[in-house]
Amino acid sequence: MNSFGIKFKISTFGESHGVAIGCLLDGVPAGLLIDEEFIQAELDRRKPGKSEFETARKEDDKVEILSGVFEGKSTGTPIAMIIYNTNQKSKDYSNIKDIFRPGHADFTYFHKYGLRDYRGGGRSSARETAARVAGGAVAKLMLKELGIEVQSGICEVDGIKSLEFDYESAKKSIIYALDSTKEEAQKEAILRAKNEHDSVGGVSRVLIKGVPVGLGQPLYYKMDAVLADAMMGINAVKAVEIGDGILSASLKGSINNDAIRADGFVTNHSGGILGGISNGEDIVMNVYFKPTPSIFKEQQTITCRDEEVDFSLKGRHDPCVAIRGTIVCEAMAALVIADMLLLNMGSEMSGVLTYYKK
């Protein structure tokens, strides 16, 4: 599937070394102020080539809105956005035309479709996520109208964990580090791996503030299930935790339960979600990225003819994909919340009457 969402839906298109990538947003309410500078700023946060901690591939990632906006506001019709690829180097991939790169989708795409675009991974490349960030920026504009904010930062790199989570500090950090006291060690780990022609993994921590009580469905479209789905659909993500996540399995119920008082919850072990429905507390997630599979060490693999070979990769790649990946996590989280808000409008008769009985 190339689409995500029910009421607020995003569809993306394009490949890493194709002419362009882009997205189509369907379900954006008419009258939303579309701040193109904000959308571009979000793309700039994710775009490659900004520092030595990212891929050397430089793309302007200039977004162009093709439809669905008139005089600065959404019209209620599909919003199409396009981002042209300008810095492809397809020749870097000529030596892997018939080779399956370990850790990539080459093997599975070939066996599913009978062919594959070997230039930078084609559709399976993280380049596609720029389109998601563009769509997520529009979702953020809608959430802003309701006082909802999605933030994120890096809380772990190569096993070096943050002891504090400062989201304002993360905005100023070149690697979006949540803990300034751990940032230098995390940077060193990334550069060390890069110099060794290797890569490291990392963890993005996502915080969603201002979510009202009641978003999410009780069974098959639970808030936490859909958020996990959205995160797991991001390239290189291997695990997602909501609230205390894995730690919950080692706690007693008396500790894990969030006590409730008249002024709200005492703790937030649940991460802002109970029974698949938001409880009004901050929604907190940890999203785990594996090490970038594109490394420059010699590796063993096979060809599409099942021949065993040793090969070395060429190209330009992120030494830690989590760094730019955290911006994609924000975008997907914003898309989920926007979708849940629209879905929830008809959950009570009072909501229907408020809208239609004027």
From Swiss-Prot:
Reactions the enzyme catalyzes = 5-O-(1-carboxyvinyl)-3-phosphoshikimate = chorismate + phosphate
Domain of life according to the entry? Bacteria
> Which cysteines form disulfides?
none
Q: Which residues bind NADP(+)?
A: 46
Listed GO cellular component terms? cytosol
- Gene Ontology molecular functions: chorismate synthase activity; FMN binding
Give the top-level enzyme category: lyase
Note the subunit structure.
Homotetramer.
For this chain, the family text in UniProt reads: Belongs to the chorismate synthase family.
Q: What protein name is recorded for this chain? A: Chorismate synthase
The UniProt entry, under NCBIfam families, shows: aroC, PRK05382.1
Q: Does the keyword Flavoprotein apply?
A: yes
Q: Give, as in the UniProt entry, the pathway in which the protein acts.
A: Metabolic intermediate biosynthesis; chorismate biosynthesis; chorismate from D-erythrose 4-phosphate and phosphoenolpyruvate: step 7/7
What residue range is the signal peptide?
none
Name the Gene3D superfamilies for this protein: Chorismate synthase AroC
The protein's UniProt keywords, in alphabetical order, are: Amino-acid biosynthesis, Aromatic amino acid biosynthesis, FAD, Flavoprotein, FMN, Lyase, NADP
For this protein, the record's PROSITE patterns field holds: CHORISMATE_SYNTHASE_1 (PS00787), CHORISMATE_SYNTHASE_2 (PS00788), CHORISMATE_SYNTHASE_3 (PS00789)
Q: Which organism is it from?
A: Sulfurimonas denitrificans (strain ATCC 33889 / DSM 1251)
Task: Look up the record and give one Gene Ontology term from the biological process aspect.
Answer: chorismate biosynthetic process
Cofactor comment: Reduced FMN (FMNH(2)).
User: InterPro entries from the entry?
Assistant: Chorismate_synth, Chorismate_synth_AroC_sf, Chorismate_synthase_CS
Q: Name the coenzymes or cofactors required.
A: FMNH2
Q: What does this protein do?
A: This reaction introduces a second double bond into the aromatic ring system.
EC no. given is 4.2.3.5
Q: Which residues bind FMN?
A: 123-125, 235-236, 275, 290-294, 316
